[in-house]
Amino acid sequence: LEVLKGADQDISTESFGMIKTGMGTQERSRLIMGFQMRKRVPSESAPNNLENPNVLVIRGDIKIRKMTRTAEVRVSNSDELDSFIEAEKERKTKISDKIMSTSANFVVCGGEIDRDILYELSRSGVLAIQGLDSSEIEQVALCTNSVVVDSIMDIDQTMIGNAGTVSWTRRPSSDQVEDIIEIDNCPSPG
């Protein structure tokens, strides 16, 4: 741990984790100042190798909330159906616009991301990763100095964290998730 001698913060063994990626040899092992996880990157065209990304951490889903009550919608003509579909599309656009207004270009969440919202985010240069467990959510927030967000509509600029780099590596398909996402050069790597 020569690399960390003289660090201005207390470093404990609890601040370290070891991830085996199955790539390379022990000589290629390295220490990162951040967090690494295995999650599926949603698309080959997702942004990669982000430099100085702004990081947004969301505890739940990024999608329109499901109704808790059963509702029946009666549609008597195609115009009514079109307006219903348009209203849903506008709600999704409002969610993606709210996220993009924060200037975050790396977003992680504990739940699912609606595919239409995911498409808009990716098209705008935002790497969005879904399905993190609560421990991963807390680790990403800790190392990037982000505030974990519970409601997308309550996001403000003070909740956004940052990192030095975010990159992902896709491995050949198998029965396991093989994408390795690395958040490095973080302001608070512990």
Regions found by a protein language model. Name each.
Residues 1-190:
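Extended amphipathic alpha-helical scaffolds
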